[in-house]
Amino acid sequence: SLFEVMIIASLLEDQKIEKRITITPEIAKKYISLGLEVSLSSNYGEHLGFKDNQYKELGVKIFKNEKEIIVNSDIIVQLGLPTDDKLSCLKENQTVIGILNPYSNKEKIDNLIKKKINNFSLDLLPRITRAQSMDILSSQANLAGYKAVIDSFAYFQKAIPMMMTAAGTISAAKVLVV
């Protein structure tokens, strides 16, 4: 073939601060159908119930050595900016996509730019109709709000939904989400 296969990769996030992942098996399947090769850290989605075998069955390459993933990939997608030791492995013309928080990580981003590494900070995407399908702020804020409501109901002293039973009706709880 005339073209090299582009490799997209993702590394384990710092699980103390980030439980989400960027590539679920469903997303990996989409990338592969587009002709991309996918590489992930071993146990990448384990904490969310995604086993390495689920990924391998789709054709995803699983690596124990994250530096090997970095060196051999074209695009790295992460939720947060990778750690300094991982960033130091990046080479010219690679691309990092994620929530890079460039205002707080200005020095790190500047260093990546000096190394000619492409950066796409999804948290800076304009909130316009054309970019709506990539608007991570709205989707994640929506998810956070949903989780906040569910978490708060654990402390609520009444039944939440309206319940109609043979014994009677319990009206729905009224809450204010701020």
Residue ranges, per PLM feature:
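Glycine/serine-rich phosphate-binding loop and adjoining beta1-alpha1 elements at the start
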Residues: 7-9, 85-174
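Conserved N-terminal Rossmann-fold NAD(P)-binding element of oxidoreductases
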Residues: 11, 177-178
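An N-terminal-biased, well-structured beta-alpha scaffold segment characteristic
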Residues: 6-111, 115
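Short, Lys/Arg-enriched N-terminal segments with co-localized hydrophobic residues
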Residues: 1-5
